[in-house]
């Protein structure tokens, strides 16, 4: 179970996701927790070892195959950045996220990610698809072609 957005395992707001804006896109809206997002990403440890990625080599949005997931259904650090960092990511944005273990996979880790791991993700938001039945104006949603 993940801690609530922006909170650590004890519920205190003293852990932060650090976001470095690499590229500003042309999107105008950020995802909400129930939206499905399409992203290109690379995850690595602070020593530079890559543990997960959706593309090989340098990011080329034209040839990369984005992964999709629900914005509120991932580790708290990702959800926080997608929805709240600098007002939330917009379609076309590329950010580098520095996620402390409390907002990542915690003290227990996950799969090949050891506990207490600080994670670095390079994330490119490609598209946002709202949950069916969610009321949003057409102008609020951009979806990748």
Q: Which stretches of residues belong to each language-model region?
A:
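Cross-family detector of peptidyl-prolyl cis-trans isomerase
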Residues: 1-145
